[in-house]
């Protein structure tokens, strides 16, 4: 049995399959999930696990070269906006509708139990060398 890192076997396996340039959408419980990308649904109850917890866990295991979020997060969810700004100084912002369109091209979608609006970020995988 694994003793550290991401223990969810579906998520750990999906992360191992990612490559440079692949997209990973980390989303709240209300984000529409498009057909196509692989989905690992971690939502258990409203707020569990939180968006911040999941992003933190993913960043411990992934190299991220870019991140995109919805412009609306700035006004609708200041706490999430501050988190994203702190983690991703070069955060790109697009309208929420555009983020939903971009999510269709993600390789992986990780759905959290987050119950606050616009807690979504599309990560672009980098390389460790």
From Swiss-Prot:
Pathway(s) of this molecule: Carbohydrate metabolism; D-ribose degradation; D-ribose 5-phosphate from beta-D-ribopyranose: step 1/2
E.C. number: 5.4.99.62
GO cellular component terms, A-Z: cytosol
UniProt-annotated catalytic positions: 20 (proton donor)
GO biological process, one term: D-ribose catabolic process
Gene Ontology molecular function: any one: D-ribose pyranase activity
UniProt cross-references to InterPro entries, sorted A to Z: D-ribose_pyranase, RbsD-like_sf, RbsD_FucU
Amino-acid positions noted as binding substrate in the UniProt annotation, renumbered to this chain: 28, 96, 118-120
Swiss-Prot/TrEMBL keywords: Carbohydrate metabolism, Cytoplasm, Isomerase
Localization per record: Cytoplasm
Chief location bin: cytoplasm
Catalyzed reactions: beta-D-ribopyranose = beta-D-ribofuranose
Oligomer status and interactors: Homodecamer.
Record's function text: Catalyzes the interconversion of beta-pyran and beta-furan forms of D-ribose.
NCBIfam families for the chain: PRK11797.1
Family under the similarity heading: Belongs to the RbsD / FucU family. RbsD subfamily.
Name by which UniProt lists this protein: D-ribose pyranase
Annotated organism of origin: Streptomyces coelicolor (strain ATCC BAA-471 / A3(2) / M145)
């Amino acid at each position: 049995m694994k003793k550290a890192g991401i223990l969810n076997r579906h998520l750990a396996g999906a992360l191992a399959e990612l490559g440079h340039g692949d997209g990973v959408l980390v989303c709240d419980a209300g984000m529409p999930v498009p057909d196509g990308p692989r989905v690992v649904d971690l939502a258990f109850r409203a707020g569990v696990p939180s968006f911040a917890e999941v992003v933190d866990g993913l960043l411990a295991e992934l190299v991220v070269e870019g991140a995109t979020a919805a412009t609306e997060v700035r006004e609708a969810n200041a706490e999430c906006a501050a988190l994203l700004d702190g983690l991703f100084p070069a955060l790109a912002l697009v309208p929420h509708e555009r983020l939903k369109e971009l999510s269709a091209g993600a390789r992986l979608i990780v759905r959290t139990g987050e119950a606050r609006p616009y807690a979504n970020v599309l990560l672009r995988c980098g390389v460790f060398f």
